Amino acid sequence: MEPKGTSIQDIKRPDGISYFPFKNGRCLAWDYTCPDTLARTHIKKFTSTQAGKAASRAEDGKLKKYRHLNNDYYVVPIGIETLGSFGPHALDFIKDIGHRITESTGEKKSTSYLMQTIGMAIQRGNSSCILETVQDSKKLDGVYYL
């Protein structure tokens, strides 16, 4: 079953929705996106001028996409670029989760651990993203893959 109002015109839905109130009495609805930092469209306009700009723009797009849910849900767009730059909403959300874990467990390094765990997961996927972005070239014949 889908919670009421989560389906939109293009049949896409948020990646997840909590069944309990998360903040201000509203349930959490999140949607994750991972823009390619090295994509030509991002390098020319965004990532060459400011770290995290592609992630920030992706988050803004998610907020517009789910604006109709804002009255019923606490909508969090999570944008993290392939090379690890966090969008502002993603960073605030992760810090909030880390703070909640710290309050619950007393472990002061919860936020740091959470950030490192997410960073490692992103790094695992980086090699495939980079290899897909870099086109085949004879200039790359001297590159050795480990």
Where are these regions (language model features)?
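Non-catalytic C-terminal interaction segments of nucleic acid-processing enzymes
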Residues: 1-14, 22-28, 34-146
